[in-house]
């Protein structure tokens, strides 16, 4: 009846054995990444579906319901107030309850095709006419293969939506960008006035030039 040769029979595996006649379960697959440039618009009202099915985007929280993808934020972040974007077209944290370490992790991005990778995103942190001594905090972090490192910390009050960009050189895990957004309360009892929103998350080529409008 011939000789059975055990080994990996899946051609997409890194240890594929073309001589194997029986799969022994030893297949090893390369890590799945989405190729840069990428652009997430949060337009479905659901957590994004990543390139690596079923879903490489992740959310987590120590306490609270964490990042949301639908529903209407409160106070000036409401779509009926200072926020001019439609419900279900951005991601946000509701600080009306207790939220600790709400994390939104972006799918892994292969940046090997970029000369200098950068992260861009739109951010909304606007108290409007409400009063609070300090705004809630957005931590932007990158994983280098060992630990999460701080790319930026945003604790600010700015009118409406604003775009922020950060070069990722030195923050990558080899040729992979692993990014997460972590929101934290200011710790003040008035933190519920300041829901935090993000939109249009992009990882693409860094753009250099003069940024002084004067």
Stretches with model-predicted labels:
Residues 42, 121, 165-191:
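Extracellular beta-strand ligand-recognition surfaces/modules
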Residues 111-115, 124-134, 187-188:
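Extended, low-complexity, turn-rich repeat/linker tracts enriched in Gly/Pro/Ser/Thr and Asp/Glu
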Residues 97-103, 131-132, 186-205:
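Extracellular carbohydrate recognition
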Residues 95-114, 163-165:
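Short beta-strands within extracellular/lumenal beta-sheet-rich domains
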Residues 1-51, 110-111, 116, 193, ...:
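Primarily marks secretory-pathway-exposed extracellular/lumenal segments that are disulfide-
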Residues 147-172:
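Extracellular carbohydrate recognition and processing domains
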Residues 35-93:
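Extracellular glycan-recognition surfaces and repeat-rich motifs
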Residues 90-102, 154-159:
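Extracellular beta-rich ligand/substrate-recognition surface
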């Amino acid at each position: 009846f011939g000789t059975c040769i055990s080994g990996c029979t899946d051609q997409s595996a890194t240890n594929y054995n073309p001589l194997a006649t029986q799969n022994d379960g030893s297949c090893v697959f390369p890590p799945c990444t989405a190729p840069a440039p990428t652009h997430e618009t949060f337009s479905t009202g659901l957590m994004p579906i990543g390139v690596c099915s079923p879903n490489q985007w992740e959310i987590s929280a120590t306490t609270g319901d964490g990042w949301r993808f639908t529903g209407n934020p409160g106070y000036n972040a409401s779509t009926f107030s200072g926020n001019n974007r439609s419900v279900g077209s951005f991601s946000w944290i509701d600080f009306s309850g207790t939220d600790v370490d709400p994390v939104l992790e972006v799918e892994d991005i292969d940046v090997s095709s970029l000369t200098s990778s950068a992260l861009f995103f739109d951010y909304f942190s606007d108290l409007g006419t409400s009063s609070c001594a300090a705004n809630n905090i957005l931590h932007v972090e990158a994983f280098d293969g060992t630990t999460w490192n701080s790319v930026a910390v945003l604790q600010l009050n700015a009118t409406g939506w604003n775009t922020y960009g950060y070069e990722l050189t030195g923050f990558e895990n080899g040729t992979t960008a692993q990014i997460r957004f972590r929101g934290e309360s200011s710790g003040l009892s008035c933190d519920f006035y300041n829901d935090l929103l993000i939109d249009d998350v992009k990882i693409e080529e860094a753009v250099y030039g003069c940024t002084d409008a004067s």
